[in-house]
Regions:
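ER/Golgi luminal nucleotide-sugar-dependent glycosyltransferases, focusing on the catalytic module
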Residues: 1-297
């Protein structure tokens, strides 16, 4: 059986108890949010888990009403929690806030997502086929790019980042590694508590400060004048620094080597392994699929 392939039996998840769905929400309706969450809760790997839905809302809704509306629209008996946040930092700040304030209470796995999933069918497919108890990090984006080093990194869009900024983050996240890394997109991924706790909490706290502190480097005029995002301006509710952190979740949570295999000329499996590296090539069946998986003990 492939290392990363799913099992048809929920017994595979014995000993894995909790899963939180952490949602960054602006003003999306409860019905819309539930239309993405409901199908996710229905997939096999989540059956039998104690699951919570945690909404970080920056909208004007009264939290209790939003919570009640979500409970009405989500067709499962799950705990729904709505936490109000200031409209600062978008999803990156919401995720970092969740990690830092709930450090001791993180679920076994957390699905981080925005209120509107990109390619939700692909998210469900990836979770169904590749989410297993020892998953440490699973990118749920339909897009992926690879950077050979932090001082030569750019992607298909107009994004890049200064080597000083990338070098600083990379050296703190992966101080013993000098290898390439895969960029993540869309602000949707799964991370285990084990992998999050493998990092220094202060790193996440310092990154959060870049978003919420108006005097931070990320909100300085010098940073905002970089040429790689033409036509975009920085603000507390739309920080340019968010484009960078969106791409670096794998770096922040997975400080281990990257292994790449190419299958059938067009299929890539990006596997991140804590210990031995075992190609799970038989699990990669679909053309043009980009997967990032970290396997823990």
């Amino acid at each position: 059986m492939p290392l990363i392939a799913r099992s048809s039996s929920s017994n595979m998840f014995q000993g894995l108890d909790t899963m939180d769905l952490v949602v960054s929400r602006y003003d999306e309706s409860a019905n819309s949010i539930a239309s993405y969450i409901g199908p996710i809760l229905n997939i096999t790997p989540l059956s039998g888990l104690t699951t919570r839905v945690i909404i970080y809302s920056t909208g004007q809704d009264e939290p209790k009403k939003l919570r009640d509306d979500l409970r009405h629209h989500i067709p499962f008996n799950v705990d729904v929690i709505v936490r109000q946040r200031p409209n600062v930092g978008r999803e990156c700040a919401a995720f970092l806030h969740h990690i830092t304030t709930g450090w001791q209470d993180l679920a076994d796995h957390t699905l981080f997502m925005q209120a509107e999933l990109h390619h939700s069918w692909s998210v469900r497919w990836r979770m169904q086929d590749y989410f297993v108890p020892n998953t440490g990090f699973l990118s749920l984006s339909d897009v992926s790019e690879y950077c050979s080093s932090w001082d030569q990194c750019w992607d298909h869009s107009t994004w890049s980042e200064s080597s000083d900024v990338l070098g600083s983050i990379y050296s703190r996240a992966s101080p013993t590694l000098r290898q390439g890394f895969t960029l993540t997109y869309r602000g949707q991924f799964i991370a285990s508590r084990h992998r999050i706790h493998s990092q220094d909490k202060q790193l996440f706290q310092d990154l959060l400060d870049e978003f919420v502190n108006p005097r931070s480097m990320a909100h300085s005029s010098g940073y905002a004048e970089h040429p790689w995002l033409p036509g975009k301006s920085d603000s507390m509710d739309r920080p340019l620094f968010g484009y960078t952190i969106e791409r670096l979740w794998g770096v922040l949570i997975c400080d281990v080597p990257m292994y790449n295999w190419r299958i059938d000329a067009q299929v890539f499996c990006h596997l991140r392994l804590d210990q031995s590296c075992i190609p799970a090539l038989r699990s990669c069946k679909t053309v043009n699929v980009l997967i990032s998986v970290l396997v823990t003990h």
